[in-house]
């Protein structure tokens, strides 16, 4: 990167006066409606609403919906969009989230009328194309993961975890093994793992990690007994390190009657190269909105399909999609199923996008993992002289750095993350995993170029150099974003989630 790096803001140069300070809420906009189309006489007789709905309680006054002209609303939304970072603006190295660029063609395919304008309760004969896509996607995902069958119903990764654990419970119950109520989970696991286990009514037992970041096999063996239903693992783990002892863990788990659960959050490092089923995993959940390039979106639209080995197929959520000759059908006759876990059949639009993504790569899908690992290792090599690394093990698709022990005493991960925003660069995940103090987790994904990786590394170097000169300036960052630091404690204790009119 040539020349000095200076903080910059996203958006247009020379902002208009309305950019100054906070963007008003849509309720605060309004005013002259301008020129509007004239109302057309349609010859429809009108009647009072009370006469049309006798006996129904009606509002005394209309709701306080904003009356905003369309041009004003369009500009308001445009300004908000420019204030938010996104992949159209630059790299998004949010560790453990796989924020890759999603191909626009997948969006176009998901909007085809034959997919977008159908209803899930139409007769199966009317939606053969949609059922065929689901049937074929299941088999593609089975080939990628090494599973026997997959349910496409779960709507997110954590939902998939809960679904997988419910199938594990059903499996043990069907064998009369009803006293298995514990789940072993590594200390570096995603927080959704213990949350999902608790929601399923299981007791969580934490397994410690080795200094190299991998699961301590001896600690697993110490906790394995007849009360353990499953072990949940992520591979590579949340430190970006491949679990080299996974085959041994699978062996001792199965010998003790427990099952091995695969959190597919990090499958982007392995897709096309290695399969969880070949490692001994019995249940797998995937994040289509990570590995298979469907959109991320605040709690949805996500998709967290769950795959199982042959021994657990009877417990899959119903219905499943089956093929009878050239016809596709929905099978509701599954007496051992855990039942439905989602309205309809899952987030179908996400399935269309993932299917298109996988078919576009075809047999070359291993390039996803190869380039994801290459990018992460290159970025890590650039940052080694800037931040200490959490572990010395070679990373896969992501890695964890730390500001603890850096050449600037008192440098915090939060300050680095906030200052990055001033440079128009999105921050890595901070303070996760919790086993690493002052953690910064970077995941560049396979869709980034060397130029964008160099930009991120150079900005990090500039921030550390700045901290050596004036650490207090970082402590108050960001300085050039529309919103600076917020009171996170107040926001957590007293969240304001809706607009209320001034009394």
Task: Name each model-derived stretch.
Residues 148-154, 182-185:
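A short, small-residue-rich loop immediately preceding and capping a beta-strand
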Residues 1-149, 166, 274, 324-341, ...:
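Non-catalytic terminal extensions of PLP-dependent enzymes
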Residues 85-106, 153-161, 292-307, 311-312, ...:
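Conserved phosphate/anionic-ligand binding catalytic regions in large, soluble enzymes, centered on
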Residues 301-305, 309-344, 348, 353-363:
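Long, C-terminal catalytic modules of enzymes
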Residues 129, 159-325, 411, 437-438:
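Conserved PLP-enzyme active-site core in the AAT-like
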Residues 151, 205-207, 428:
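General small-molecule cofactor/ligand-binding pocket signal
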Residues 98, 156, 189, 237, ...:
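Short, flexible loop/turn elements at secondary-structure junctions
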């Amino acid at each position: 990167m040539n020349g000095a790096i200076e903080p910059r803001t996203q958006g247009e140069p020379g902002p208009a006066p309305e950019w100054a300070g906070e963007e008003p809420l849509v309720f605060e906009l309004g005013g002259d409606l301008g020129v509007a189309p004239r109302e057309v006489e349609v010859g429809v007789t009108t009647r009072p609403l009370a006469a049309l709905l006798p006996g129904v309680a009606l509002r005394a006054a209309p709701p306080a919906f904003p009356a905003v002209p369309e041009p004003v609303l369009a500009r308001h939304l445009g300004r908000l969009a420019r204030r938010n970072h996104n992949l159209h603006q630059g790299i998004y190295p949010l560790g453990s989230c796989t924020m890759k660029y999603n191909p626009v063609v997948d969006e176009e395919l998901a909007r085809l009328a034959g997919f977008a304008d159908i209803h899930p309760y139409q007769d199966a004969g009317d939606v053969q194309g949609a059922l065929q896509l689901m049937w074929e996607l299941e088999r593609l995902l089975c080939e990628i993961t090494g599973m026997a069958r997959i349910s496409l119903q779960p709507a997110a990764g954590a939902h998939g975890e809960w679904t997988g654990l419910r199938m594990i419970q059903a499996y043990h119950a069907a064998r009369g093994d009803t006293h298995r109520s514990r789940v072993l989970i590594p200390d570096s696991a995603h927080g959704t793992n213990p949350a999902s286990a608790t929601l399923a009514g299981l007791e969580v037992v934490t397994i410690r990690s080795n200094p190299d970041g991998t699961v301590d096999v001896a600690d697993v063996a110490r906790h394995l007994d007849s009360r353990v239903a499953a072990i949940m693992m992520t591979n590579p783990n949340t430190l970006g390190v491949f679990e080299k002892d996974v085959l041994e863990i699978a062996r001792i788990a199965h010998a003790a009657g427990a099952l091995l659960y695969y959190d597919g959050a990090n499958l982007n490092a392995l897709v096309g190269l290695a399969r969880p089923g070949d490692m001994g995993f019995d249940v797998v959940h995937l994040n289509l909105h990570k590995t298979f390039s469907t959109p991320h979106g605040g709690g949805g639209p996500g998709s967290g399909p769950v795959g199982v080995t042959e021994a657990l197929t009877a417990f899959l959520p119903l219905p499943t999609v089956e093929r009878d000759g050239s016809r596709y059908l929905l099978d509701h006759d599954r007496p051992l199923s855990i039942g439905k876990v989602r309205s309809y059949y899952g987030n179908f639009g996400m399935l269309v996008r993932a299917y298109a993504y996988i078919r576009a790569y075809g047999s070359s899908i291993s390039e996803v993992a190869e380039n994801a690992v290459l990018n992460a290792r290159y970025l890590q090599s650039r940052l080694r002289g800037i931040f200490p690394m959490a572990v010395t093990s070679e990373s896969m698709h992501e890695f964890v750095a730390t500001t603890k022990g850096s050449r600037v005493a008192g440098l915090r991960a939060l300050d680095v993350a906030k200052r990055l925003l001033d440079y128009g660069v999105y921050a890595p995940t901070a303070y996760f995993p919790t086993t690493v103090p002052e953690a910064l987790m970077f995941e560049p994904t396979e869709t980034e170029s060397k130029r964008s990786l160099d930009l991120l590394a150079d900005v990090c170097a500039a921030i550390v150099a700045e901290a050596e000169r004036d650490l207090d300036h970082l402590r108050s960052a960001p300085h050039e974003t529309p919103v600076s630091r917020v009171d996170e404690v107040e926001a957590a204790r007293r969240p304001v989630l809706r607009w209320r009119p001034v009394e």
